[in-house]
Amino acid sequence: MAVILLLALALVLGCYCALHRHKLADIYLRPLLKNTLLEDFYHAELIQPEAPKRRRRGIWDIPGPKRIPFLGTKWIFLLFFRRYKMTKLHEVYADLNRQYGDIVLEVMPSNVPIVHLYNRDDLEKVLKYPSKYPFRPPTEIIVMYRQSRPDRYASVGIVNEQGPMWQRLRSSLTSSITSPRVLQNFLPALNAVCDDFIELLRARRDPDTLVVPNFEELANLMGLEAVCTLMLGRRMGFLAIDTKQPQKISQLAAAVKQLFISQRDSYYGLGLWKYFPTKTYRDFARAEDLIYDVISEIIDHELEELKKSAACEDDEAAGLRSIFLNILELKDLDIRDKKSAIIDFIAAGIETLANTLLFVLSSVTGDPGAMPRILSEFCEYRDTNILQDALTNATYTKACIQESYRLRPTAFCLARILEEDMELSGYSLNAGTVVLCQNMIACHKDSNFQGAKQFTPERWIDPATENFTVNVDNASIVVPFGVGRRSCPGKRFVEMEVVLLLAKMVLAFDVSFVKPLETEFEFLLAPKTPLSLRLSDRVF
């Protein structure tokens, strides 16, 4: 009986040892040996159990929607599954963040993985990487189309080029448009653009309801006029009240919108356009052709006018043409690159400027205290131009615009290609991995900004100096125009023009939206259209 009990005890002890070797060592052996010299127990040493080696987690270990052969994770957008709408992709990515965490894997039908980053530390690590030539994934449909048209394009353009060629285009083509000194020369002309826009709004609103229907169409015309004033150096007359615009001009904004939608569908769809000309590809080609034809015609007309008036042009007119002339006079670039760059700048500026204005207006009209404070900063400029000093001192207005950028940037996420191996959120990613930095979603988190879903311009005002500042906690993830060398070259122009437009509209009208603004994804974030605004004349 005693033998059986001893065997049973040994069996229990053996099982316990097998399952909890480290507990046995810590609880039983260490107390027995702690006061005993090594030589007293035949130099025996306690053998530590080896910690199991942790497997290195790679890209395919990242959580995300289930992958299906030949579809990847794109099945979530297909009609017969219809979990999500592609027009609400910004909301889709927010939902994936809630489901899977701060790092999510998306897989293309070609089995190419794309990693979505939501963690602030990961975003900063990727976007602040010191690179001479930051790499971002090219928009393949643009690359494919432009390579098929060597008669028009010598390269795939500044946005889609990479490496030294990108650097060459960037440094040559953007030096003027990014210069604060050059942009200040345009302030009087841009004031005039804003004034004409205000008069056009007055002419187009319903006299009884004071509602301007299809406001976005007029905003696009304003964007076209403002960008052409900058790039070509003279007013084009697109905001004239009594002049009927040519049909091609009215089609231009629609073509720009279609261009972005086709890019979205080509990037997030199944990619069949790569193998035969699908509707997505045909729509893109038509839009690209129309944009090129219309703006190219404007440029050619300006070149002829320039030749005629070069001898008698005054200094002011020559100053306004500085950007246009600087690009045309570049000797080391193909004329096709010069022309396509001007076309790209104008096309991108139309929708970006109009959408940014609408997002800012939506934010400030939703805050009852915002409009009076903006008005107080510009009330002395009712009958005069708003020049640089006024822009510099517009603390609250700039804070409102910055807060709108945080909540609804037109570029809500930024794409990069990793240039070296990185560990992000505990996963090891190899160089060459495509990552999407989900900055807007990160900006909506209370862990990054207190009251993150609320419109709070005051967060961008230094309480000590009462000046506008971007030196606040986590401001580095608010990047509506990109960051670093790959940032949008039109950033300064858009910021200056939006301040002017907001000031002029608040001086002229009490603005309200007939219906709350909704957003859609069109490769950039855009307002859902049509939009109607109620504009009541402001009485002082």
Swiss-Prot record:
PROSITE patterns, per database record: CYTOCHROME_P450
Additional information: Member of the Halloween gene group.
SUPFAM superfamilies: Cytochrome P450
Record-listed E.C. numbers: 1.14.99.22
Localization per record: Mitochondrion membrane
Location, primary (coarse class): mitochondrion
Function comment: Required for CNS development; midline glial cells. Involved in the metabolism of insect hormones; responsible for all ecdysone 20-monooxygenase activity during embryonic, larval and adult stages. May be involved in the breakdown of synthetic insecticides.
Highest rank taxon of the organism: Eukaryota
Biological processes annotated in GO: border follicle cell migration; central nervous system development; dorsal closure; ecdysteroid biosynthetic process; growth of a germarium-derived egg chamber; head involution; midgut development; pupation
Entry cofactors: heme
Species of the source: Drosophila melanogaster (Fruit fly)
UniProt family annotation: Belongs to the cytochrome P450 family.
One Gene Ontology MF term: ecdysone 20-monooxygenase activity
Protein name as annotated: Ecdysone 20-monooxygenase
Keywords: Heme, Iron, Membrane, Metal-binding, Mitochondrion, Monooxygenase, Oxidoreductase, Transit peptide
Tissues showing expression: Strong expression by embryonic stage 10 in epidermis, decreases significantly in older embryos. Third instar larvae show expression in the midgut copper cells, Malpighian tubules and fat body. In the adult ovaries, expression is seen in both nurse cells and centripetally migrating follicle cells.
Pathway(s): Steroid biosynthesis; ecdysteroid biosynthesis
Residues where heme binds: 488
Catalytic activity from the UniProt record: ecdysone + AH2 + O2 = 20-hydroxyecdysone + A + H2O
Cross-referenced InterPro entries: CYP11_CYP27_families, Cyt_P450, Cyt_P450_CS, Cyt_P450_E_grp-I, Cyt_P450_sf
GO cellular component: mitochondrial membrane; mitochondrion
CDD domains listed in its UniProt record: CYP24A1-like
